[in-house]
Amino acid sequence: MSRKCAISGKGPMVGNNVSHAKNRTRRRFLPNIRTVRVTLEDGTTTKLRISAKELRTLKKHS
């Protein structure tokens, strides 16, 4: 199961941990993925793994 939003396709990004001494080590920034149950237009419900931002967008427009 990938860490990817089913709607926006948002996935992990890579960057650096930077210490106080400016030492840099690689790290991953993971999206805030939530599993939610969504009711579709035809009345059926399905589970989606979507990011928290897309969940807010869904709540706003539905």
Curated annotation (Swiss-Prot):
Transmembrane segments: none annotated. The lineage of its organism: Bacteria, Pseudomonadati, Campylobacterota, Epsilonproteobacteria, Campylobacterales. PANTHER family: 50S RIBOSOMAL PROTEIN L28 (PTHR39080), LARGE RIBOSOMAL SUBUNIT PROTEIN BL28A (PTHR39080:SF1). The keyword Repressor does not apply. GO terms for cellular component: ribonucleoprotein complex; ribosome. Belongs to the bacterial ribosomal protein bL28 family. InterPro entries: Bacterial_rp_bL28, Ribosomal_bL28, Ribosomal_bL28/bL31-like_sf, Ribosomal_bL28_bact-type, Ribosomal_bL28_sf. Signal peptide: none annotated. One of its GO terms (molecular function) is structural constituent of ribosome. This is Large ribosomal subunit protein bL28. One of its GO terms (biological process) is translation. Pfam families: Ribosomal_L28 (PF00830). Keywords: Ribonucleoprotein, Ribosomal protein. It comes from the Bacteria.
